[in-house]
Amino acid sequence: MQAAKRILSLTLVLVLVLALAACGAQSSTATTAAPETTAAPETTEAATEAATEAATEAPAEVKHTVYPLTIQTYNYAKEPVEYTFEKAPERVWAQNQDNIEILLALGLADKIVGACGLDGDVREDLKADFETINYYDKMPSKEEIIALNPDFITGWYSTFSDKRLGDVDFWHERNVGTYMALNSACRGKAAENPQTVEDEYQDILTLGEIFDVQDRAEAIVNDMKAQVQQIEDYLADKTRLTAAVLEDEGGTYRVYGEDVLGGNVAIHGGAELVVGKHGNNGSISAEDLILANPDAIFMVWYDGYSVGDVDYAGDHVVKLITENPAFASLDAVKNGRVYPINLSGIYCSGMRTIDGILDVAKNLYPELYQ
């Protein structure tokens, strides 16, 4: 009987121990489950961070042009035409400052067999490459250019006049590709086809695609866009200063308004244009300017610019406004806000597009750049 009691007691103790062990196991499981639940977001966050770092460190995929490549350009009748490139051009004739500088910036100096048409000095950052190309101080004849055996010509609308190189079909029939800068009047009147900064971006991107250097072209354009965005962000909650972009034509003033690149550059630089609204691309009188009374005036100049046989190139151009007694009442004159602006930054500007934009922005909003 005593033995039976001892067996029963041992059995009860064993059951109790097992029960306590089971409770302990459940308690332990519950305790460890909670940290696992709260730790999950931390693990996900760490994984996301690691993936982001890996993506940042991974080299970006380089775009490559797929040939044959068909682009749209224009003929001298201002009609759109297409040309197909079987491969990247190897022998290029580059006409005018914008095209020369774009090709140099894209690293294509070794592809240029001849160039002509600079309006001034080449950009400082491109001078070394410029020294390596075959540059003509005077425009060669059509026959001389044919002798260079080019496979691509990039220029302005005027490049393809009969007095110069002839219409594009002459070259296309000889397997020589062509490209006209979009803002060189190749598409017709500006009132119907406004000239924009975005067109300058497109010239760079198109040339980049033709030569299979899209990564370089996109880097250039993206840098310009980032600087423009900085201006936009700054002005998001501010009133824009009013401005006029003018060229003295000897008593009247040519307006660079909303429909032409000069006006669009000024708008991108933060200006509110008070003359040259859409469809009004003519000239204004002194009286019109006094009536408009802009906060700032930008006077256009270029190398060799003169009025009445007087040299007004560079900073001298502002004297056409500041030293004219008729304009003494203008706010821009009284406040010292008449500025020079170079034509190369506001007409078929290419790489200099950002120079024109910053000329406007830095003069209107100097505090943004301090």
Predicted regions span which residues?
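Bacterial Sec-exported substrate-binding components of ABC uptake systems
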Residues: 12, 23-100, 209-245, 363-370
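Short helix-initiation/N-cap motifs at beta->coil->alpha
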Residues: 74-79, 131-143, 278-286
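C-terminal motif of bacterial Sec signal peptides marking the signal peptidase cleavage site
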Residues: 18-22
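Bacterial N-terminal signal peptides that target proteins for export
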Residues: 1-11
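Extracytoplasmic ligand-binding site segments that recognize negatively charged/polar headgroups
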Residues: 121, 160-166, 176-206, 239-263
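A short, structured surface patch at a secondary-structure boundary
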Residues: 91-158
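Alpha-helical, coiled-coil/dimerization segments enriched in small aliphatic residues
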Residues: 118-122, 130, 255-281
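Structured C-terminal subdomain patch of bacterial secreted/periplasmic proteins
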Residues: 194-204, 209, 218, 299-370
